[in-house]
């Protein structure tokens, strides 16, 4: 009987963990599985040691190999990996007679080594680039929404919380006036900021406690509560509520409008695969993937409902983790913002981003709409438009869109539009006396440049490959690997998964 433990070499001259595949194991594996295992040879597993706080029976290098191999074979749960450790010849050989780790050990290892697992992923990507599997010229980015482990009905809406917080603040101000009437406070509520009101009511609560009253006295019909005890209970309840509201608003943050009670990192989003076909909101994460030559070369996760703010973090991560720099960047219209265009051009990328008006701008209705500033004559030197009736529309103001970072100009007709024969076509729903609109000239110029790039021979080739490269990664994750819903709470655990 062959000693299979001799076929697994776990260290070389430099102490580097690696895996060798021999003939007796190759007969048990499919060719594509062999290729993936050979790809793991020579990777650096030393970073896994730093997260272990005690001596473990299974070496961290071996554990990393076991987990990656199990995921390759389609086993993603810790209990499924534990069963595989007891039955699979390859993993038994890796363990070299050591008892198989149980599911808690496997789960704890994954939880502690999120950063190291991500680093292992980018080691594989760099190795793919070194052996010529990647084009290393154009990177394709796209995102998908994957449901969180949290329940559907655990939502917390920021607007609702803020509304209740305002009501609670008004009640607390009223309670301060009541405490003044009872002689428990001398602070006038009018003109005070809420922080001072909150601090004073905390003092009022302490003063009532020092009076020695029965604060737990039963209330109800036939029982008359002391006004100070009643005030104490109301103040205690509202102070607790305002703290809960402040914590919820802080957890939601400025860029979100919702969160889940059981998974505060998750945001409620409309999922495409809704069974009821009505866009039901579910707690989810926005998973972003960068692809090259049908390989996933980068991955990020966020709580954003849109893709606007995901381009820059992805490219910064690729610059940091990969040993080369891409020259072209391709994405769909979800990434069409001035901030993304400016970042890509500043850092030497050629942006092949489809404008949001790419399809609608080709329609006859759009091109014949005389009310759109895109169809008006524009004098760039003096910065004014000329409408279909030959009247001048000059710039009267400017601003910046906070969401997209795009600057715009406010333009208004120099003459009244009353009596103009084209007013009904030009100002269809507006009841203003003269034509007025906001023109995003910076974004307009960037979209024109992007449209020229996409219509070039190189742009057509990249545009044809975009859906194949970007959407193929999601087909692999969602279709083949069945990743439809995360099994862990928190954005970090979800990303590791």
Regions found by a protein language model. Give the residues of each.
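Generic low-complexity, intrinsically disordered sequence content enriched
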Residues: 14, 29, 40-43, 272-273, ...
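Basic, short loop/linker segments at the boundary and entry of helix-turn-helix/winged-helix-like folds
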Residues: 23-68, 439
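Anion-binding and metal-coordination hotspots
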Residues: 5-6, 10, 56, 67, ...
């Amino acid at each position: 009987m062959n000693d299979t433990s001799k076929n697994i070499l776990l260290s070389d001259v430099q102490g580097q963990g690696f895996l060798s595949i021999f003939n007796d194991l190759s007969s048990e594996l499919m060719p594509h599985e062999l290729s993936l295992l050979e790809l793991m040879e020579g990777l650096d597993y030393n970073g896994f040691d730093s997260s272990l706080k005690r001596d473990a029976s299974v070496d961290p290098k071996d554990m990393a190999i076991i987990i990656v191999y199990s995921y390759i074979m389609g086993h993603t749960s810790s209990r499924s990996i534990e069963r595989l450790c007891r039955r699979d010849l390859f993993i038994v050989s890796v363990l070299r007679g050591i008892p198989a780790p149980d599911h808690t050990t496997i789960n704890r290892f994954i939880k502690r080594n999120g950063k190291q697992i991500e680093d292992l992923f980018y080691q594989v990507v760099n190795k793919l680039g070194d052996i010529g599997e990647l084009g290393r010229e154009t990177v394709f980015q796209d995102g998908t929404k994957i449901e969180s482990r949290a329940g559907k009905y655990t939502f917390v809406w920021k607007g609702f919380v803020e509304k209740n917080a305002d009501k609670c603040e008004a009640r607390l101000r009223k309670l301060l006036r009541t405490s003044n009437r009872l002689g428990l406070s001398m602070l006038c509520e009018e003109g005070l900021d809420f922080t001072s009101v909150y601090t004073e009511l905390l003092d009022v609560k302490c003063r009532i406690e020092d009076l020695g009253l029965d604060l737990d006295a039963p209330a109800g019909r036939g029982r008359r509560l002391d006004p100070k005890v009643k005030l104490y209970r109301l103040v205690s309840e509202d102070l607790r509520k305002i703290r809960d509201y402040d914590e919820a608003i802080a957890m939601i943050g400025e860029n979100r409008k919702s969160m889940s009670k059981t998974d505060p990192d998750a945001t409620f989003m409309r999922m495409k695969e809704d069974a009821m076909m009505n866009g039901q909101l579910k707690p989810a994460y926005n998973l972003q993937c960068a692809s090259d030559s049908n390989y996933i070369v980068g991955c990020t996760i966020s709580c954003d409902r849109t893709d606007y703010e995901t381009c820059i973090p992805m490219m910064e991560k690729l610059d940091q983790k990969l040993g080369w720099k891409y020259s072209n960047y391709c994405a769909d219209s979800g990434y069409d913002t001035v901030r993304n265009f400016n970042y890509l051009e500043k850092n030497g990328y050629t942006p092949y981003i489809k404008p949001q008006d790419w399809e609608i701008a080709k329609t006859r209705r759009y091109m014949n709409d005389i009310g759109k500033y895109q169809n008006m004559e524009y004098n760039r030197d003096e910065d004014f438009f000329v409408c279909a009736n030959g009247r001048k529309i000059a710039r009267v103001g400017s601003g910046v869109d906070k969401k997209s970072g795009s600057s715009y100009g406010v333009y208004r007709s120099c003459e009244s539009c009353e009596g103009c024969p084209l007013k009904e076509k030009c100002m269809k729903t507006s009841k203003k006396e003269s034509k007025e609109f906001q023109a995003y000239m910076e974004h307009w110029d960037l979209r024109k440049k992007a449209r020229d790039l996409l219509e070039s021979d190189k742009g057509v080739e990249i545009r044809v490959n975009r859906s194949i490269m970007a959407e193929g990664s999601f087909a692999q994750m969602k279709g083949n690997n069945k990743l439809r819903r995360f099994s862990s709470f928190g954005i970090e655990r979800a990303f590791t998964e």
